[in-house]
């Protein structure tokens, strides 16, 4: 019988989601993230609050960074991640009318990086039929009050 199961990746995801929740809430945003979800492509959403009112909802996909995500000799980007292309296709195919963000979590250093996936950003990735795509990011993508 084909029944869903809990695997090692579910435990890694749970840790990443917990870190993301804490850091995002410290920055005065509400979030609804799902752990061990089987909803394809997205893990939940963040609500940005301004003057005690919800002003924007952003759909999110959360990924755990590997321990070795630093680039050693790059002038342009400091970090990289080989990402499943499903979240990029969500943007490309207009699956959600809300903006979509990729949340990358460094569980070792407890850092959260946030990349807004605009249609232009996704188009420039040239995902086409690929199942993974390497993306690059920097310290400026770290989630903070700015």
Please report, for each region that a protein language model flagged, where it lies by residue.
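Mixed-charge (Asp/Glu-Lys/Arg
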Residues: 1-40, 46-146
